[in-house]
C-alpha cells in the first residue's frame, strides 16, 4: 500500500495539499500517483506570480509510461515552485511528500480545501480504483 499521510488533503486526481503555518498551500502528487506513473522524467510547474484556479490544470508530470496533468486544489497566486524538479524530476518518485513537492500557492480562499478528501477518504478512493 502506498504511503498516505493523515495531515494532508487529497484530490481524486491524486494531488495532495498541505496548509502551512503561514496559510500558504503546498501541492504535489501522492505516493500512489508516482507509483502508478513509474519513473518521472519531467515536471512542468506553473510560473511564480501566475494565478491558478481550484480544479484547473496547473502543470504536467511526465514519466516513462505517461503524461498527466496536475490540478490545483485551491485558487490563488503561485508564490514558489520546486526548482529541484527541473534538474532532478526523479525526486517525485523518491520523496513525493517532502522534497518532491511541485508548487506553493497563496490561496484566495483556503476553505476551498474543505471539499478535498482526508486521508481516510483517499485510502477508500484508492482501494475502490483497484
Curated annotation (Swiss-Prot):
Summarizing the function annotation, the protein's role is: The glycine cleavage system catalyzes the degradation of glycine. The H protein shuttles the methylamine group of glycine from the P protein to the T protein.
PROSITE patterns, alphabetically? BIOTINYL_LIPOYL, LIPOYL
Q: Tell me where in this chain the Lipoyl-binding domain is found.
A: 24-106
Which gene produces this protein?
A: gcvH
- Subunit field text: The glycine cleavage system is composed of four proteins: P, T, L and H.
Transmembrane stretches in the record are none
The organism's superkingdom is given as Bacteria
Q: Which cofactor does it need?
A: (R)-lipoate
- GO cellular component labels: cytosol; glycine cleavage complex
Q: Which family does it belong to?
A: Belongs to the GcvH family.
Protein name in the entry: Glycine cleavage system H protein
Amino acid at each position: 500500500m502506498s504511503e498516505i499521510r493523515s495531515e494532508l488533503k487529497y484530490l481524486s486526481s491524486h494531488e495532495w495539499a498541505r496548509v502551512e503555518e503561514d496559510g500558504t498551500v503546498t501541492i504535489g502528487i501522492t505516493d500512489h500517483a508516482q507509483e502508478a506513473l513509474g519513473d518521472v522524467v519531467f515536471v512542468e510547474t506553473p510560473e511564480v506570480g501566475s494565478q491558478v484556479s481550484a480544479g484547473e490544470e496547473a502543470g504536467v508530470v511526465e514519466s516513462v509510461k505517461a503524461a498527466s496533468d496536475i490540478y490545483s486544489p485551491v485558487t490563488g497566486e503561485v508564490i514558489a515552485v520546486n526548482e529541484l524538479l527541473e534538474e532532478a524530476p526523479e525526486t517525485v518518485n523518491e520523496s513525493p511528500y517532502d522534497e518532491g513537492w511541485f508548487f506553493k500557492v497563496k490561496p484566495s480562499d483556503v476553505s476551498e480545501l474543505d471539499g478535498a478528501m482526508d486521508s481516510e477518504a483517499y485510502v477508500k478512493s484508492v482501494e475502490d480504483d483497484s
